[in-house]
Structures are given as C-alpha cells and as structure tokens.
Amino acid sequence: MNSQELKNRQEKIRNFSIIAHIDHGKSTLADRILEKTETVSSREMQAQLLDSMDLERERGITIKLNAIELNYTAKDGETYILHLIDTPGHVDFTYEVSRSLAACEGAVLVVDAAQGIEAQTLANVYLALDNDLEILPVINKIDLPAADPERVRQEIEDVIGLDASEAVLASAKAGIGIEEILEQIVEKVPAPSGDVDAPLQALIFDSVYDAYRGVILQVRIINGVVKPGDKIQMMSNGKSFDVTEVGIFTPKAVGRDFLATGDVGYIAASIKTVADTRVGDTVTLANNPASEPLDGYKQMNPMVFAGLYPIESNKYNDLREALEKLQLNDASLQFEPETSQALGFGFRCGFLGLLHMDVIQERLEREFNIDLIMTAPSVVYHINTTDGEMLAVSNPSEFPDPTKVDSIEEPYVKAQIMVPQEFVGAVMELAQRKRGDFVTMDYIDDNRVNVIYQIPLAEIVFDFFDKLKSSTRGYASFDYEISEYRKSQLVKMDILLNGDKVDALSFIVHREFAYERGKLIVEKLKKIIPRQQFEVPIQAAIGQKIVARSDIKALRKNVLAKCYGGDVSRKRKLLEKQKAGKKRMKAIGSVEVPQEAFLSVLSMDEDTKK
C-alpha cells in the first residue's frame, strides 16, 4: 500500500477500551461486540472470551489487558477497523488500565443500571480524562428488575460531569444496544493521529513469552510502518532485532504484511532474553530511528511486599525464571533475592496490592508448578535513625536495633468508600478501628454516600477489603491511592519458638495493639504447630521484652505402663530418666513450622479489638 492508501485506512481506525467497575458487565459487553462484528464464529464463542487465563475465568475477573481487531460495517456503508483493548476493573490492576488507555483514543464507560457509579468507576474515568480520551457512557444491565437508568444517567452527569443525554441504554447479556454502541464509537471516537511517513514509533503496552518465538511484543503504532524483515531497535537500551512476523489478534494471532500508524498488534523478532524488553518502551527502526522515545508509562511503585520461598529448595532457579517471565507480562511486579533462616532461599517481591499478590502466587503455582510458602505482607516504612539517616525498609527482619531508631513513618492512603447510607455507621466504625482519620463525606444522591478516610496502608493490607464487604453486605465499593507518610508509634514484634527467633514470622505493629496482637498470634501458633517430644515455649517479644507466652506441652510415652504396683521410687526413677532425655532433646531439638503458621500471622482473626 502506498502512503496515501495507508492514510485513508488510518481515517477508518478507531481504538477504544471499555472501562467499568468490577462486575458491571465489561467482559460480557466485549463478548457481544465480538459476536456482533462476527470476529469470532459462534462455534468458538464462549463467555468471557477475552479472559484467556484459567484464573481469570474462574474468579470472573479480568487481570490482563487484551487487544483485539474487529471489522465493523457502519450504517454509512463504510467498513471501519476497530481495536478493542479490554481492561481490568480491579483497583490492584490500575496499572494495566492506564497502559491500555494510553493506546486508545476513546473509552466506553460501562455503568450498571442498578448499582450506579462505584468508586472504581470514578478512578478509571479520571485515568481516561488524564489521557484526553473521548468517553462514551453506556448504561448496562437495563433488563434487571432493579434497574433505574434515569437515576444512573443523572448520577453520571452529577458525579462525573459527563453529558449522559446520549448515553446508550444496553444489556450486554441480552444483546440490546450493541449496535448503538458501535455506531457511537465510529462517530465520536477520533481516528488515530500520527504520520505514516514519519520514522517508526511503537509503544509496547504488553509482552508475552513464547517458548518457540521468544518474546512477543504487543504494540500500538503511533507513527510509521513496520513489516517483517525490518530491523527494529529498542529506544531504552539500543538493542536491535530482526522482525520475523507482525500481526493482529482476533483473539487468535493472525499474521499480516505490515502494521501501520494507528494499528494495535504484535511484533515477533526472536527476542531471546526477557530483560531486553520493557513495557512502556518505544520500538523504532534501526536504520531510520525516531529522534525521541514516546512518553511511555509512569513507573508503578509496589505497595505491598512479601517473601516467596519454594517449598522444595532445589526449585529456587525455577522460581527465578518463572518470576522473570511473569514480570515480562506484568510490568508492575518487582523482586529481589533474599534468604531466611527459617525458609532458606527465596525472593522478596513487590506487588500493587493484595489481589495482585494472590494472583501472582496462583499463577506461579499453576503455570510453573512451583509450590510456595509466602510470608506475611508488609509495606515500606521510613525509619529515621538516631544518626540522622532515613532508611526505607519493607522487610521486618531488616529493621534496625530499636535503640538506634529515632522515629518510624508509615504510608497512609486516601481511601474513598462509596456505600449506601444505612451502612455508613459500620464503615466508619471499621475505618476507626483500622486507625483511620475521617476526612470528609459527600452525599451522591438520596441513598449513597462517598466517605473519605486517611488510613495506614498496613491496615488495609491485612483484611480491610473483606471486612468492608462483610460489614456492608457487599454493597460498599472501595478505591485508594497513596497520599503521604506519617510518623507512627510502631514496633517490631518477634516470635520465638523454643527461644529462637523465627525471622519469617516477625511483623510490624502499632504499639497500642502490640500486646493483643502478640497474645493472639501466640495462641494461634499453639493450635497450629504440632506437639513435639519436648515442651516448646512460644513467645512474642518486642526487643528484649516478652509480651505474651504460651507453651506447647510435650508428647510423652507412658513409661509407667510396665509397672504394676511396686515401689513408688521405681516409678520416680523412670520418670526422672524420661525427663532428662526430654531436656537433652529440647537443647538440641528444632521445631518444624508448618505453612499454616505463616498464614495465620496473615489472617489475624479479630476477636480482639484489633
């Protein structure tokens, strides 16, 4: 194709993504759009087609973004090329959302006609506005008995400030309103800007590792053209590769002769090393490079850290390779090697949030067959020492000696909780219990309230989300962003088994709750750790001070079984002998800590005030 034909083709391209809160019907809408445009034959169609990971389908959530090309013949008789970039809705995957939005010109905002706007809907809308996207509101699930489209239309205008007078009323499940959505995309979403004749600039928004073809890049072409046989170059590190294949996804990969400005597709170039590519990097041609890279993405900082250790220590290298491959596909995962006396060699990993951590652990166990032990998650604390230094510490075992600590700061988040009015009391009580500071409260409509709190991230990491859902019968929606570091009265609590510290069980706790928390864990461990041949004391300590203790009684053989009557001194002799043996065992014996013990530190049952 000559450059004029390419420019005409570019006029017909529409790149859009679908944004919504969890469960508002985003993946179902994507399915309907694929059916309507006949991208997927009815034989291949299955629910949540774009959620390709088993894990996504089981949990009913979207984790990875996906990019699909569709052809749609509009009412004006022209055929348009639509690129649908599917995005996750969960707060932990905001990074995935921001990456997909950067590759689009428009966004379809799906709002549930019964539930209305939720906290994550807002968060994603603001991301879309940051990227200057054309936003098309769609009110979904209008066939539900509880649907109230007019109220939701008003809500979109009041809360977000978008004109919702032309919002499409749709039901993705029943297939209502799908054509109107496609027509609006064609009419309202602008064609990609960009110059076909300029040097190639392609933004990598995702990548996957293929055992045969190496790393496959998913790109959005911003300027220029790329075709097989070209030599491409990464702008961040200057590495160059020969393109073997380019193409698009119609969920399946389909090879093409070229990818031109505005296209969303993949490039395979026999890239062997995972480390050579980075999501957010710019690809250009080696013989005609672009003068400067694209903006890319802002680097995401992990919020939650945890140690991952293989249960079989010989799987350490497998774990490293698995993490490298996952990192390729999930740019926000970070990891570095660490060792623990209790657990051996493993990695300290950084995640965006708890769901992200859960998903990574499950993917490692499923896709790479590695059995893992995971330590309690912690956040990054800033420690000001008496020497005037500031240390950033995410691992409790790296905490300096308490005598050298001047003050400790912990991250606070600004939490937005949207909740029906009747549950406001329960939410406020929960936030207060989690050391939250009340900021403000706005009424969205007669029934729904947006409550804003400043809460320490460490409190959210444990079980805030579960507690929030259960105390509001699942009606609350929640979104958070890091706001600042504040000084707090924090202490490090060590757990001692048989007098030895178990480094993997250490955790950071607020001084006020230290005693209760210590007591709770000691009692929990007592139930979980199997009885030994000798007595095992379990202690919780802050520095040198023991705050709680519980003993696991020894198992003992009945050495008096053979004595029928007889002198009491004979019995005493046997008991003393047994006692001496137990004492010797205790001196040299070590205690096996089962995996549940590490998990119990996580799921602190809050029978106490904490």
UniProtKB/Swiss-Prot annotation:
Disulfide bonds: none annotated. Required for accurate and efficient protein synthesis under certain stress conditions. May act as a fidelity factor of the translation reaction, by catalyzing a one-codon backward translocation of tRNAs on improperly translocated ribosomes. Back-translocation proceeds from a post-translocation (POST) complex to a pre-translocation (PRE) complex, thus giving elongation factor G a second chance to translocate the tRNAs correctly. Binds to ribosomes in a GTP-dependent manner. Belongs to the TRAFAC class translation factor GTPase superfamily. Classic translation factor GTPase family. LepA subfamily. It is a peripheral membrane protein. NCBIfam families: lepA (TIGR01393), small_GTP (TIGR00231). It holds the Pfam family GTP_EFTU_D2. This is Elongation factor 4. It comes from the Bacteria. GTP binds at residues 23-28, 140-143. Coiled coil: none annotated. GO terms for biological process: positive regulation of translation. SMART domains: EFG_C (SM00838). InterPro entries: EF-4, EFG_III/V, EFG_V-like, EFTu-like_2, G_TR_CS, LepA_C_sf, LepA_CTD, LepA_IV. One of its GO terms (molecular function) is ribosome binding. Keywords: Cell membrane, GTP-binding, Hydrolase, Membrane, Nucleotide-binding, Protein biosynthesis. Its EC number is 3.6.5.n1. It comes from Streptococcus uberis (strain ATCC BAA-854 / 0140J). The keyword Nucleotide-binding applies. Residues 11-193 form the tr-type G domain. It catalyses: GTP + H2O = GDP + phosphate + H(+). The keyword Hydrolase applies. It is found in: Cell membrane.
